[in-house]
């Protein structure tokens, strides 16, 4: 029979009106205590009885009638029939008041035992039979009879009950012994019939009396309590009117004793009838009349007639809750009769007739009238006495509590509110109910703490914890506050132990603990459980992939493939069958069910409730996909189901979180829930069952508690952490310090000695980090923040008023309007803030990286006055802002440079006099990369006036701009050059006389890159005559040919250059004397970018000697080659630099003495960005760089490398800094005496000094995805401009890095809409302008490139909306000056992409290998495959 209530049993639905509050055990309000009135009791009884009326008639017991037997032993059997329910009756006190009372003295009874018992949940109809045996000749036979009677009449349960015995002599009736059982008063329980046994004394009366007493004592009936109402009633209170059951046993004495042994004394229990009584007196009447006539026969063998009676005395009929119980008691008379079969048959027939109808047949009764007449007076007196005693005792029981006794096997605990509990289920007893204890938060928290320890102990076995166990073992009388106690415990578990309490079965109230730290498989458990949970994941995946169920045969087929077989013990899993069918089932990981109607029985496995909470179908699907090396979408049905479950689970999680937060707020649950000491000594293991403990005697040794208890609140040097979502006034962490994680306004916060750290997007007033220092992450309105003694740092604040970093220094990352920021002693730095009023970088200086409106010194600010990277007299620079005045990368006089900004005045990269350069800006005036006089250059801008890359007089050059006037890359006289435009007049890259050059045009006449007589050059076009790149005598150059003789980029004597060829002799980019250069060739000798004496650079070659980008003395540079010596970007003595090479010596960007720089190599000496004496720098090498003025020792950028020493970003005395190295020692971002700091070591994803609403920027090395210095609206930027995605100085495995752009998604030193570029070694880098996607000087396997010897996707000096262009040595997918297999570009391998076309080119490759498509034409022309390939 299905029977579950809140604790595992079902309650029938109520048919009547709802009961009053509190009558069904529902919690009272804490400040209200109610009492149940008489009307409430009547109403409740009516409701319960009406609800269970039908259920009473459902399970009639089976009537077993004995067959006639000729044996000497005849059993005494009972026939029990359930009585239907009756209408309600008035309350107990009315019954007791209206009934005439009989005093104990008037009754004068000898002994009357009254037993009051209550049992939970179910009502039992206990049919008891008392056998009165006449005295036999042998006394030992009597013991056997009474023992059997006791066995048949025992109660089915062994729970305790309160017993009150009232004794009084029954002198008036003068009865020998009367045993009366008065059962527990229950509001809707019927009166129990009393067993009345009369023994007529035979010969040995004393023994017969003892036997009868034993039989009576063993025939005790237990009635079950039904509900928990507050009204006290007694046995005599009757909710349903029942008819009295008259059972008479007539014995006829006969002289024939031979057949007396076959006499059968049958006890017949008939159905009760309902009699509606209008008054309380009739409603309380319960009479049991019994008459026993014992006629002694002459022979003693009749004693065997009752020997088998006790075996079937008691039949138990269970009825649901709130049913009427009528216990019929049988009177067994053992008769000694003489022989005479007629008398026996008459008596049997009379009894059978009487059991069928309440009105017995008069004819049958007449035959035994003489026997009834003899006992009629006795029956009347006994009935009156019993009723009087019940009525009198009724009032007493309503005032007296029950006593508690302890049973050995099953213990029952009774609570203050009248609850009586046994096992895992209990119910409330209305007459014993008391009001719930008052709500005391301290006591509730104490119970919650105990519950936490209780749950942690119980969860060790992973068997779900029952709510009833928690109520019984921990919460006890505070069960009214169970929701609040368990919520407090759940909060403590989350905050202290990082586990969540989940109710997996609301019907059975089962709870589990789930850790917030998942394993890779998604299933959670300790280390010792890992093998089992791995096996569980296999089983779950099989079930899920087979339609959410799997037969046992399928499971074993899979397990056999893993070497697991039933019956074979495994070293890790033990008995596998027991593990998957018993342990996992108990832990609710699996369900193991029999297939319906299967013959022989078959079983199936399903997911258990715990599995749905500890993992998900998506995780299991991915697990299966990893095993089979497939994509989850290959299983469309399972994938769709997993996605739906994920969405549903997410919605449920959000709803539960909101509901829990609201509930906790209403209950006032907060940080106090985790306060207070924790003592595990008061926790025993009695709460564990034998099943959970197992056979281990030392149970505690099986449990390991990994507890991360937090420091106590309000202790010395305590921490104050605020995780609230509401407004927070102040939060302190560690000695007054505070840390605040909130999305609402935060006034103040401190971290470590008054400092504070604030994480949030709402207005943040003040935050301090480390001794009144502060750091603010993402606050919308950040007023003030300090970092390291009045210093502050602000990340992404919209409105940042003042920030300081390191002694009133400040740094602002992406704040829109930044009023003042100081970085290192009054200095300030603003990274891409649109409105930056004043920013200083290193001692009063101001620097803005990407700010739109920067008053003083802005790297990409609109109005930037001056910025110096160590050069002597420079005016201003702006990296990708609108208005820029001047900038100098070590040049003597440089006016302005604009990396993608609209109006740019002048810029000099180490040249003497340079006017302006614009990388992608519209109007660009002049720029000089180390040349003497340079007017303007525009990389992709509309109008460009002049540009000089180291040449003496350069007029203009336009990379993809429509009108291009002239450009000189170090040559004396340059007129014009167009990279990809339709009409190109003349271009001189430093040559004296240069007529024309067309990069991709159909007809190209002449081009001279600085060479004196330069006739023509064609980059991939059909007709190509000559090209001189600034050399006096330039013979020939071929971009993509196998053998290239000479090319001069501005140098006087230039011998040969091969862009992608195997052997190169010489190339000069504006240098006076240039020996050789190889752009990805194997062996290159020298290259000079407008520097005076330069030996050799190799852009991707294996061996390179020297390169000078405008520097006076430059020794060697290698962009991707293994050994490189020196490079100087405008500096006087520059020794060596290597972009990805193994050994690099020196690099100087405008500084005086520079020793070495290595971008990604193992060993490198020095890098100087404008500082006078700079020792070493390495961008992922073992040593370190220095970016500073003054005596900066060393710096290590170590992007992905192990050991970086130090770095200094600023003047003064900087000691060291490590930016992302594995073992980076220190970093100092300021002047004065700053010692060390480390920014993003090891595996940093992104960090930087980047711009506006930038997503990720920084100097991040290792496995950093993006790094940079800039960006206005870029997601991540280097030193760059507007909409830069990701760029910077990233080495190692960085994705992209660059120095700025205007609207580029990622850019190097350029503007436009470039995607990714920069100076980084390994993946990508770029140096360029316009609307190119990916370009740069990078080495390694680039997706967007530079001068590399490894596969690169795209780079180059291209203009217009070209996709991918670059100088790459390896396989390039885009277009560029590279060798090796490239899909499009200037490479030696296969090239498939587009070239330098002015129109919509399909693809072109200036490579030495096979080129699938070339389009160096204007318009929509596509020349098809290019023939300049050798691979």
Curated annotation (Swiss-Prot):
Pfam families: MAGE. GO terms for cellular component: nucleus; plasma membrane. One of its GO terms (biological process) is embryo implantation. Could be involved with bystin and tastin in a cell adhesion molecule complex that mediates an initial attachment of the blastocyst to uterine epithelial cells at the time of the embryo implantation. Directly responsible for homophilic cell adhesion. Residues 1-24, 341-365, 401-433, 1342-1365 are annotated as: Disordered. Sequence repeats lie at residues 751-760, 769-778, 779-786, 787-796, 805-814, 823-833, 841-850, 859-870, 879-890, 901-910, 911-920, 921-930, 931-940, 941-950, 951-960, 961-970, 971-980, 981-990, 991-1000, 1001-1010, 1011-1020, 1021-1030, 1031-1040, 1041-1050, 1051-1060, 1061-1070, 1071-1080, 1081-1090, 1091-1100, 1101-1110, 1111-1120, 1121-1130, 1131-1140, 1141-1150, 1151-1160, 1161-1170, 1171-1180, 1181-1190, 1191-1200, 1201-1210, 1211-1220, 1221-1230, 1231-1240, 1241-1250, 1251-1260, 1261-1270, 1271-1280, 1281-1290, 1291-1300, 1301-1310, 1311-1320, 1321-1330, 1331-1340, 1341-1350, 1351-1360, 1361-1370, 1371-1380, 1381-1390, 1391-1400, 1401-1410, 1411-1420, 1421-1430. It comes from the Eukaryota. Residues 405-415 have a biased composition (Basic residues). Strong expression at implantation sites. Found in the placenta from the sixth week of pregnancy. Was localized in the cytoplasm of the syncytiotrophoblast in the chorionic villi and in endometrial decidual cells at the uteroplacental interface. After week 10, the level decreased and then disappeared from placental villi. Also found in macrophages. Residues 444-642 form the MAGE domain. Residues 1342-1363 have a biased composition (Low complexity). Keywords: Cell adhesion, Repeat. Residues 751-1430 are annotated as: 62 X 10 AA approximate tandem repeats. Directly binds bystin, and indirectly tastin. Gene3D superfamilies: MAGE homology domain, winged helix WH1 motif, MAGE homology domain, winged helix WH2 motif. This is Trophinin. It comes from Homo sapiens. InterPro entries: MAGE, MAGE_WH1, MAGE_WH2, MHD_dom. Coiled coil: none annotated.
